[in-house]
């Protein structure tokens, strides 16, 4: 058995695993690398794949070539998904950074997305605290803290009351 034939099963297992992972949802390249490097849980506990670094690179390249792995598509879908769940731009940026997406790619996608963050912040505040929003200082501070935790920028939060007064 030659070395190239002995590496073939490891590459095939890695490729199969990558396609299965990417079939569930989009992943960033760094996420996919981390998941591929993790041991597989078998019947007798964790099993290591005896794949080389070259096998990992070939699998990642194959996924890019065939459209299974695309960081720009992942970023756009991630921003849309997290904003629908009520998270603001600061939190989304932080989560994308944790997933290995570059700051430039994140900023580009944030500029291209058509999301009104102020309206989204207002929707989150009214969903949690009711309509009309409280004007008492102590209640405004609670709402502000809640929205900051959700990742909204201070200027968007202040615009809620500025627009509310108009």
Swiss-Prot record:
Q: Does the keyword Cytoplasm apply?
A: yes
What intrachain disulfides are recorded? none
Q: Which domain of life is it from?
A: Bacteria
Q: Which organism is it from?
A: Escherichia coli (strain SMS-3-5 / SECEC)
Subcellular location per the Swiss-Prot or TrEMBL entry: Cytoplasm
Family assignment? Answer: Belongs to the RecX family.
**Classification via InterPro entries:** RecX_HTH_1st, RecX_HTH_2nd, RecX_HTH_3rd, Regulatory_RecX, WH-like_DNA-bd_sf
Protein's UniProt name: Regulatory protein RecX
Q: Which UniProt keywords apply?
A: Cytoplasm
- Name its GO BP terms in alphabetical order: regulation of DNA repair
Relate the protein's function as given in its record: Modulates RecA activity.
Q: Could you state one GO cellular component term attached to this entry?
A: cytoplasm
